[in-house]
């Protein structure tokens, strides 16, 4: 299958992405886990992503808010290695790493997974 959407992620969100992708008919998303941030193995990363370098969309997906987690460390490396800045799929910037509400957490989690898989429904209300 041809990859149109390359998703880079780390940790538990990988399993959420896999589960959601299984429910999408004819998904053109490839998911790659990045688990070693430092020292970052640029040669290994290049080897793993090379077959997907021409994907229309490259995404970094994380559960943490925009201003937390691995994004701020990794996006300059990804930009250098991929020649473009990946799209960020995750929670908006916030002072707290958690919502404090399980219901809201589940809603946000489903939204960031759908966003990463390019399955968001745009509302025009």
Regions found by a protein language model. Give the residues of each.
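Active-site phosphate/pyrophosphate-binding segments
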Residues: 1-9, 13
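Short, well-ordered loop/turn elements at secondary-structure boundaries
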Residues: 1-4, 25-26, 53-55, 83
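Glycine- and acidic
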Residues: 2-4, 30-33, 56-61
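Hydrophobic/aromatic-rich, well-ordered segments within soluble, folded domains that form packed cores
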Residues: 9, 45-48, 52-66, 73
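Active-site proximal loops enriched in glycine and acidic residues that flank catalytic Cys/His/Asp
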Residues: 9-11, 33-36, 41, 61-65, ...
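Generic long, charged, amphipathic alpha-helical segments
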Residues: 14, 18-54
């Amino acid at each position: 299958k041809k990859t149109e959407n390359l998703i880079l992620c780390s940790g538990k969100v990988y399993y959420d992405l896999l589960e959601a992708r299984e429910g999408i008919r004819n998904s053109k998303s490839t998911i790659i886990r990045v688990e070693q941030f430092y020292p970052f193995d640029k040669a290994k990363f290049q080897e793993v992503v090379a077959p997907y370098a021409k994907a229309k969309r490259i995404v970094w997906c994380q559960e943490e808010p925009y201003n937390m987690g691995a994004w701020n460390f990794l996006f300059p490396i990804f930009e250098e290695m991929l020649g473009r800045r990946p799209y960020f799929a995750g929670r908006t910037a916030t002072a707290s790493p958690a919502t404090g509400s399980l219901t809201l957490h589940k809603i946000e989690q489903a939204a960031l997974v759908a966003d990463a898989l390019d399955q968001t429904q745009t509302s025009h209300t």
